Regions:
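C-terminal charged interaction modules
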Residues: 104-135
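GIY-YIG nuclease catalytic motif and its immediate N-terminal context
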Residues: 1-54, 80-82, 100, 127-135
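Short, exposed beta-strand/loop patches in secreted or surface proteins that constitute
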Residues: 1, 88, 115
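Conserved short loop/helix modules at catalytic or binding sites
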Residues: 45-103
Length: 135
């Protein structure tokens, strides 16, 4: 997915950043310089976005760090301070997120988007869920 959605929020470390997202369940898309690199779902997207900046809490941040720093290791839920600092700046310079509220079927939508874009280099791993695939 190389087009930008209508509601794209560029990452900031401002506490109000997560208020851009719905409190309800939904699917969110993470973009690196406008290119889709991660698909996620949550029962509360706003709360999930609060976790977005913490390596210990968010799979995307761990995967991005390992992708950018081949061989980087995580200790006590985070990278070393130098890598964490670089990731913070990388988020600010490159990362944006879009989300849509979806009450029912969000895991199926997430799974289908991952399946559709897995060959384009997204950082999602194979789904551990046994969601029905609708293509």
């Amino acid at each position: 997915m190389y087009c930008l959605p209508n509601h794209l929020f560029f990452f900031t470390f401002d506490r109000k950043w997560s208020s851009n997202f719905p409190k309800n369940g939904g699917v969110y898309l993470v973009f690196d310089k406008g290119v889709l690199i991660y698909v996620g779902e949550s029962a509360n997207v706003k709360e999930r976005m609060k976790d977005f900046k913490r390596t210990v809490n968010h799979t995307f941040r761990r995967k991005l760090g390992k992708h950018l720093f081949k061989g980087a290791t995580i200790t006590n839920g985070k990278f070393n301070d130098e890598i964490e600092s670089y990731l913070n700046q990388y988020y600010i310079d490159n990362i944006s997120v879009s989300a849509i509220e979806i009450i029912f079927g969000r895991t199926e939508i997430e799974s289908n988007l991952i399946e559709k874009y897995k060959k384009s280099g997204i950082l999602n791993s194979e789904s551990k869920r046994n969601a029905t695939q609708f293509i």
